[in-house]
Amino acid sequence: MPLHVEILSTGDELLTGQVVDTNSTWLMDRLWDLGVMVRRKTLVGDDRADLDAALRETSGRSDLVVVSGGMGPTEDDLTSERVAAVLGVPLELHEPSLRALEERFRKFGRAMTPNNEKQARFPRGAEVIPNRFGSAPGFAVRIGRAEVVCFPGVPVEYRGLADEWLLPRVAARLGEVPASRLLKLFAVPESHADHAMRPVMDDPANEGVRFGFRAHWPEVHVKWTVPGPGADARAARIAAAVRGIFGDAVFGEAKEELPALVVARLAARGERVALAESCTGGLLAELVTGVPGASAVIDLGVVAYANAMKEAVLGVPAPLLAAHGAVSEPVARALAEGARRAGRATWGLGITGIAGPTGGTPEKPVGTVHVALAGPGGTTAVERLYRGDRERIRKTAAFEALNLLRLALR
């Protein structure tokens, strides 16, 4: 029998759009790795009647209900209270949780106000789940057919408790855990990925395998979950097939990120990169330096927006700019070579383009971007025409530069 799981997320801030419920999407992804697809997700505000109704409805049709939020010390934190009301039991003080809470306040040198005691009160009979990630413990009860698990809504606490307590419990309940794999593709449209994967997905040998695609442009993630005996071997065969279909477009697996991958490859080779950016305005440098250990591979990053700075700082010849314009392949090449020279680096990356929303022409419309890579074997360049708003164009251009370097570092 499949495990019927629902997620119940609480808080007015979720319904007003002030906070995005990332906890639910994270948990859905982790449960999918176990072969469990969440059947429903419900959002409910800080209203007693609505919470009571949602708890009764979800617990009446599911095996497991995961509740987030409403576990804090304030007046609008209602989860423990409403679970107790639905069960028809009182709230009781859990002394170990109270002592842990008092110790936490002492540790941080803060006075504990009386309302914080609320975080140590749970419905009678609840299983209390200690929280080493924050102040409010979680708890689990049974309402009707369902196990109802309640966690704080703070993401680091919610995810920590789910990883340590909930997911192992679900895995044990399922018995045999399926094998899940994820490969990341660069700049392959989701529809193209789906079409290219049809022979794999329609293969009778892959019957029962659950495939999924997620666009996180300029990345597309291909994921599959294989049930039953020999799941690991079957998942590995699918991975080989996916790599065969997409070739160099595959840049990483589940937790690999393109900036970190590029930094790691540079470090392993003892090489360095220098950056020259125009339309991306330092976004490429931010991606690289956001990786721990990036100081081992980068000394220089320049944002040369004005033509005068392209000439003065990076040595782009004025006649080249006059002849071709700042947004052109020759200038992108000169930027990359100038960065490599100025940074005394193994590699130089140059980006120039029109991010919009204004500045485009019929010959060079908004979204026109030139990216160049200068290296020991010479300089290569690509021209792209990106769609989307300014933010999307700039982001895609920065990742395009990283991908160009990744391919050179194979």
UniProtKB/Swiss-Prot annotation:
Alphabetized Pfam families for the sequence: CinA, MoCF_biosynth
Coiled coil segments of this chain: none
Annotated InterPro entries: CinA, CinA-like_C, CinA_C, Competence-induced_CinA, MoaB/Mog-like_dom_sf, MoaB/Mog_dom
Classification via PANTHER family: NICOTINAMIDE-NUCLEOTIDE AMIDOHYDROLASE PNCC, NMN AMIDOHYDROLASE-LIKE PROTEIN YFAY
Family: Belongs to the CinA family.
HAMAP family: CinA_B (MF_00226_B)
Protein name: CinA-like protein
